[in-house]
């Protein structure tokens, strides 16, 4: 299985900036039906060509956002144990490791899933926020410095990124000086 020529032609990274509360979100693509198919091909089918498109899009955004590389760390959104077993990998963590190796930007795999959540598809924005609240926590013994850049495949409502930012700052102080996010795709408008 591979990515069709038509989908590859439509996959042209741009630069979109969105705000979720105080969280700056930088994205490469609008979340279109084609983008959805590419994300699913990577996430659920492990298609290397789709992985490469997502990696390239995220690197494009990291370059466009003009973020100072020496001052931030990439923080991947974690997958549940169930998703890891089903996919045979830690999807976003694996993509982020490749991005880190390609760019030389540091990575901190410091978030973990701390409780089971319901499937997000079909939930409203408010339901997604409620569903995700308390779903992530910091791994013990993690030392955090500088600025954090959360990495995810897509932002639709912002519930996952909100929760990840909450978990990063859950120690009663800002663990990182600032938290932003970079995603391959963004839903416009956020749902």
Show which residues each predicted segment covers.
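Glycine-rich phosphate/pyrophosphate-handling loop used in enzymes and phosphotransfer proteins
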Residues: 1-191
């Amino acid at each position: 299985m591979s990515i069709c020529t038509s989908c590859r032609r439509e996959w042209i990274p741009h630069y979109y900036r969105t705000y979720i509360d105080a969280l700056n979100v930088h994205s490469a693509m609008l979340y279109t039906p084609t983008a959805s198919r590419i994300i699913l091909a990577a996430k659920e089918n492990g298609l290397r060509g789709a992985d490469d498109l997502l990696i390239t899009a995220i690197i494009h955004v990291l370059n466009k956002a003009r973020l100072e590389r020496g001052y931030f760390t990439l923080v991947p959104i974690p997958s549940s144990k169930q998703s890891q077993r089903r996919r045979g990998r830690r999807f976003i963590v694996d993509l982020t490791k490749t991005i880190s190796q390609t760019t030389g930007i540091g990575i901190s795999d410091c978030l973990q899933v701390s409780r089971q959540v319901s499937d997000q598809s079909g939930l409203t924005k408010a339901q997604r926020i409620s569903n995700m609240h308390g779903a992530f926590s910091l791994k013990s013994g993690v030392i955090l410095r500088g600025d954090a850049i959360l990495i995810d495949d897509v932002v639709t409502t912002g519930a996952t990124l909100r929760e990840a930012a909450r978990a990063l700052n859950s120690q009663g102080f800002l663990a990182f000086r600032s938290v932003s996010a970079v995603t391959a795709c963004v839903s416009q408008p956020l749902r």
